[in-house]
Amino acid sequence: MSKELSPKYNPAEVEAGRYQKWLDEDVFKPSGDKKAKPYSIVIPPPNVTGKLHLGHAWDTTLQDIIIRQKRMQGFDTLWLPGMDHAGIATQAKVEARLAESGISRYDLGREKFLDKVWEWKDEYAATIKEQWGKMGLSVDYSRERFTLDEGLSKAVRKVFVELYKKGWIYRGEFIINWDPKARTALSDIEVIHKDVEGAFYHMNYMLEDGSRALEVATTRPETMFGDTAVAVNPNDDRYKDLIGKNVILPILNKPIPIVGDEHADPEFGTGVVKITPAHDPNDFLVGQRHNLPQVNVMNDDGTMNELAGEFNGMDRFEARKAIVKKLEEIGALVEIEKMTHSVGHSERTGVPVEPRLSTQWFVKMDQLAKNAIANQDTDDKVDFYPPRFNDTFLQWMENVHDWVISRQLWWGHQIPAWYNAEGEIYVGEEAPEGDGWKQDEDVLDTWFSSALWPFSTMGWPDVDSEDFKRYFPTSTLVTGYDIIFFWVSRMIFQSLEFTGRQPFKNVLIHGLIRDEQGRKMSKSLGNGIDPMDVIEKYGADALRWFLSNGSAPGQDVRFSYEKMDASWNFINKIWNISRYILMNNEGLTLDVARENVAKVAAGQAGNVTDRWILHNLNETIRKVTENFDKFEFGVAGHILYNFIWDEFADWYVELTKEVLYSDNEDEKVITRSVLLYTLDQILRLLHPIMPFVTEEIFGQISEGSIVTAEYPVARPEFENEEAAAGVEALKDVIRSVRNSRAEVNVAPSKPITILIKTSDSKLDAFFNDNINYIKRFTNPEHLEIAADVEVPDLVMSSIITGAEIYLPLADLLNVEEELARLEKELAKWQKELDMVGKKLSNERFVANAKPEVVQKERDKQKDYQAKYDAIVVRIDEMKKLVK
């Protein structure tokens, strides 16, 4: 153990090589202690689509805080890392890279294209692991998993087959969300709805007998070639006599029937609705009720097919313009009604999705959802933090639709279904025997395999595997509220179905990282922050402190460099007080310090400030542990900050100088012991949040790694309310004198008279017993503490519990000079107020300047006014004193 830290805190030096050393020492693996209670977390697997962003840094920091604390508390901890193949997202990235060279996946073919995707995966998996290391994540790499690993693939096949056998996976032709760019189906929750400028196109469909026209309206006229009927409400007197007759479909000039169906709302539009069963989910249901043909008029890539006649091969949106023009030419266009409406867009490619009839594989959700809902009323329920997200989960499960799980991609788990020439389907974990079978080319939705993550990573379907028996169900899941539907809910219902248990006991839901203005970080806004850039400037510990200290379950966090500066300053403060303690340590060991601290707690040694700091340390340990248990890391961080900076550094360390600068060697040893012991406990409390710097400092005072050191526990023998109250009263006196000096601009170096009039005999005795502390911090020329102290006429006074503090003004200032100074200061702020007031009264400025600029001026005005008002009050007080 070296007893010296470098003079200046340098995070790059502190963090360099430390992570690799931890890995070499195997400190992140489970302890293997069968007597210890297990605590496990599976990392939400990041997509191998690219580098991790600030949201990932937040998510993994919270997990690392939990697992590091539990490890120190003696739990047998497992934090299992891994990554997700992220089917559509990764395939889109690789296709984009190939497109830069003018190559498509079809040019390469499936096998060679997948080779390229695996190369991409290896490249970005290495990058992600490097980022994990920079963040200091204490994961067990010996158990690292990937969603396309053979073990996980086996689990995927088994789940698919079992659900198929139960009739809960089925294949059918239904309207689904189609992504024309990725050329694949999407589930409902992979579709993001955006308000876009569009139009209602009103068209006339002439009755076959030519007697009249029926007006219909659509936002997608390009689908009209798939119209197989128009519908009217059977109770609509305007049209019910027309049911059973035909209208002529414009452009194609073919007859289609008029059907009576309650889907047509007499109160909406004209009450006549065009029915396109292959391109609209509601029309599909109408078509089923009336046995209408299903006509698909688009290709996989969003171009029109041969059924669109002269528009064959045109992109759907180009076709829209051309069709509207044609309708106008033939006199079938009534009007174009501009409007804003909600249009579904692919979450991954960003293009508008196309509702489209397609043959896909689905998971039947009824019973799975019922099981998940019912489980929340049992002892095996999942606890959400904050609890309001339990309602979010239940609401979604109660309204869930069947889940389309097939994707027309190449990257992913190929569906374990085979077909032969006779039209037979074989579903199994292994390929069927014999010739003539061809496997379904589609792959499964990424979320299908991700839903099995908590138990497939533990060895399932081998329920006898050691990890599955020991660490499943997992203890806690940490994730963002944006994927409760995508992932959390699916893990719950799949785990209940296949293991009979919930996948995790707790779910900690966090929000999103936003910029300083509260905007979501995005490429389009250019406001994204690379966590590695932040680490390079401030260090991982500072970033982790910011992410945890601003964290409240379920709430968003605003990133700012000002807060990062504050984080770095806090760590620098810890570094400096650690150096002070070590420089004054005089060879004291932690074991000896513990023995001496025990004597202080027993009242056999030390002074009241020693007992006070141990009492407050004890309270801090208790409160931090309580808040960690509730995942209130932000609250815990504030408690730690206040204790370390305010109570320990600003007060206790300063108070110890009264002893350390004395000649009493016995008292010095006790004080050094309390300093060293408290520092040790602070480092242990901070370690889950700041692993690097705490390990560096801990190495100066103890053997071994802090990673596996014992986490602090509150000790009853440290409780000392009397010492706590006494020192708080001392602090009140010192603060009162300091504040009075500051009010009248009297330097701390100037000796003054201080009179303390007590009304409590115990407090009187306490102040007199500890008068040296008051003298050290207040610099009195004369100090008197008594119940009958004489108070002169002109004084500054303040009141604390049990005493009044008086400072004779004659010692403090020349009142006339102070009044002159205050009048000058008042004029200065009046000038500032006039300037900002003039700017804000300028209507052109307020109307044309950016809102944040205007707000900044208003904030200035408020600040200046507060300063002006405070000086006015001070002048009034001074004038009263003169009288």
UniProtKB/Swiss-Prot annotation:
Cite a single GO MF annotation.
Answer: aminoacyl-tRNA deacylase activity
Q: Which Gene3D superfamilies match?
A: HUPs, Isoleucyl-tRNA Synthetase, Domain 1, Valyl-tRNA synthetase, C-terminal domain, Valyl/Leucyl/Isoleucyl-tRNA synthetase, editing domain
Q: Which residues cross the membrane?
A: none
**Any one GO CC term of the record:** cytosol
Q: Does the keyword Protein biosynthesis apply?
A: yes
Q: Where is this motif: 'HIGH' region?
A: 46-56
In Swiss-Prot or TrEMBL terms, this protein is called: Valine--tRNA ligase
